[in-house]
């Protein structure tokens, strides 16, 4: 993909390549506004703080350590199908980072958590010892398409790393 400048219709200067989000909000958590408005998660929280389905249409605990999610039959905005393999890709990518959540490590999945795509729509996550915050953590695990991971990602061009940049 070639980067192309986005021009101001009034004849102003280019604002940057088309795959760059130019942010003028000085807040250190401005990335929340971007990710929560451009990506989906397995679940969401409604205005009353109650967990609601997102890309996972349902979930259940099989035992105290195993969470099973049934993923929606869905398609990304770029036309790529969403399925259990895409969920696993997102999980694997985030688990590569030491501390993917800038607000705090309490949002990270433990290193011994495993994720298995059982079939096209089923995910099984195993939490050795259990994790009462698992559903909250899923709310913060963004599930972009492969195009995002392959072309854009969360990599900071200054550091060459995605560590803590979402």
Where are these regions (language model features)?
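Surface-exposed binding/hinge segments that line
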Residues: 60, 105-166
